[in-house]
């Protein structure tokens, strides 16, 4: 169970880092938002799911 928690936390940190870099790049590019809207929404949905997963796994470990 601890390994699953550590992997979920690592995935959350990696997704946060990727979104931290990619979202400003998408907004700064001339046609970025209209062409990459689905990618940003998918990344945000993944991030929200990982936040809940880490919370659930944390409650099972503690």
UniProtKB/Swiss-Prot annotation:
It is found in: Plastid, Chloroplast thylakoid membrane. It holds the Pfam family Ycf9. The chain crosses the membrane at residues 8-28, 41-61. Disulfide bonds: none annotated. It comes from the Eukaryota. Coiled coil: none annotated. Belongs to the PsbZ family. This is Photosystem II reaction center protein Z.
């Amino acid at each position: 169970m601890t390994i699953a928690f550590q992997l979920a936390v690592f995935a959350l940190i990696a997704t946060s880092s990727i979104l931290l870099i990619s979202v400003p790049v998408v907004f700064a590019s001339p046609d970025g938002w209209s062409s990459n809207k689905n990618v940003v929404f998918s990344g945000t949905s993944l991030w929200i799911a990982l936040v809940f997963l880490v919370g659930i796994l944390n409650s099972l470990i503690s």
